Amino acid sequence: MDLINIFSVLIVALFSGVLGSLTGLGGASIMTPILVALGLPLKYSIANAVISIIATSAGSSAAYVRDRITNIRAAMYMEIFTIIGGIVGAYLTLMLPAVVLYFFFASFLILVLFLSREKGSLNDVSRDRKIDRFSRWLNIRGEYYDPGDKIYISYIVRRAHIGGPMMMIAGVAAGSLDIGAGAFKTAIQEGIMGLPPKVATTTSNFIIGMTGLAAASVYISSGYVDPVLAASMTLGTAVGSIIGSKILPIIRGRTVRILSMIITVYLIIQMIYKGVSQLWI
């Protein structure tokens, strides 16, 4: 890559890192379709973007953990499932044709939008009722101060026996598509497990790094990673994610949810268009 292209990738990665950190999608979720639009094959885009996922997670997670928004206990439970799914998904990418991947993650993101509509309000999340036996045994709960809404928010995880296995599907999507898995993780945590929007976003960012690390090992061994491209994306998304982590605590939870849904709709349109284009080639 020449210097102009490297600089362009850095700028786009910086912007993607900010948005990815704010929404929990991960900077690579925004970066991958841009690389495809610039002419890079989908599988190479996914492989190199997976590397930057690790940087996005590391860059933003430190601040979120310090502010006590991220729920580490919930993250450790869900990572059991996402890491397994990430490895499986990476191998699927190497085996499946690109057109199948386009339509697969477009369908996947439509499911994300459906789950987003089922998310409860913050008041519902705060109530310690209708907790199943397994979730009571795990006892995953937390409290944090939201400077955007100017209130303390308490919550407890519900339906962990459903949310955990569904995270394996998110892991497969993260490993095979590298795009939209963050949105799916966030939707599962809010809509099924009952986490507040900001906790779901920050915990998703924390989980994304571990899932990406598992998938990256497969892509690196298969020769799909370009060191210069991956390094440029990693630097940009890492800086962007740090900036995003400074912005998130001061904006309202509703704003985070709306921004996440807008980006998800954009990704659906982009991938359906690419999939249809592949069919006509």
Model-derived features with residue positions:
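Juxtamembrane transmembrane-helix boundary motif
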Residues: 1-16, 36, 42, 66-171, ...
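Short hydrophobic/aromatic, small-residue-rich stretches within specific transmembrane helices
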Residues: 49-53, 204-208, 229-230, 234
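Juxtamembrane transmembrane-helix termini in multi-pass membrane transport proteins
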Residues: 23-80
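Interfacial segments of multi-pass membrane proteins
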Residues: 31-44, 175, 184-199
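Membrane-embedded alpha-helical segments of transport systems
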Residues: 51-59, 81-88, 92, 207-214
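Generic transmembrane alpha-helix signature in multi-pass membrane proteins
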Residues: 30-32, 58-69, 171-175, 185-190, ...
